[in-house]
Structure formats: C-alpha cells, structure tokens
C-alpha cells in the first residue's frame, strides 16, 4: 500500500511542477496566456485583461519577439529584484513579465473568480474573438507598481486601459 501512495505522490509532484504535460500545444498556449493575464491583470476589469493579452499576441506577431505565446510569456531579458521595494539584490534572470521570475510558486491561483475569468478571456483572445484594443502595443506597465521604465521614453504611448499604460 505504501508503494502506491509513494507512486501517486511522485506523479502528483511531477504534474504540479509541470515536469511532463498531457496538454496539447494549443491548450498549453492558452494556459500560458491565462497565467499571464491572471498575474499581470488580476485586479483589472475584463477590458484590462484583454489588453494585457493583446500585448502578448502582438509580440507573437512581431519579428522582435518569440513566435508562440509561452515563449513570449517566459522570455528572459528584463531584470527583477528579490526585494522589490528597495530594489536590491538583482536576480540575474531577466524577465519580460515579473511574475515569471518571482521567487514563489507562480501557479497559486488564490483568486478563483479572477483565474476563471483569465482562462475564459485567454481562450477567446487565442481564438481571435477579441480585436486588439491596444492599437498594436507590445509593451505595458502599471505605474502603481513600478517606476516608468526606460523603454517608455523610446516608444509611443497608445492607450491607458485600467491601471496599465500601453506602448508600441
């Protein structure tokens, strides 16, 4: 009996840490987009969540970024910090979206209603049911959470939707 429990526990841990996946590529792409919507725009209305997902899709369609959703979401090249308040202890992994570099489990979806909404919006955006409301933005930031990034001076602001400022 203990061997069965050990086996089930091992399989559960492998699934939890995404060591292997039974999802097809389309499902995986939708899930990556949903995770990004949840972590980047959890407190936003649907319009803000759609806008954040539009940026990911705009990046996928750009020659300057990877060509699939998961690669865009987990792309590394922006710095993050262990202590986000004092901006000390930089982490050498650079992240496009800060939640992908947070030193905590990033799949803890404690706000179930927002997670459900993020999944629904992700699927609809993936299927092309929502037009781009950001005017082609490939970047955004929330000034309540971070200082104005250096790249904002070099890009054109397209919209302010919810708490996020969008640029291309």
Q: Language-model segments: what does each one mean?
A:
Residues 2-23:
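Classical Sec-dependent N-terminal signal peptides that target proteins to the secretory pathway
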Residues 24-168:
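Bacterial extracytoplasmic/cell-wall-associated proteins, especially those involved in peptidoglycan
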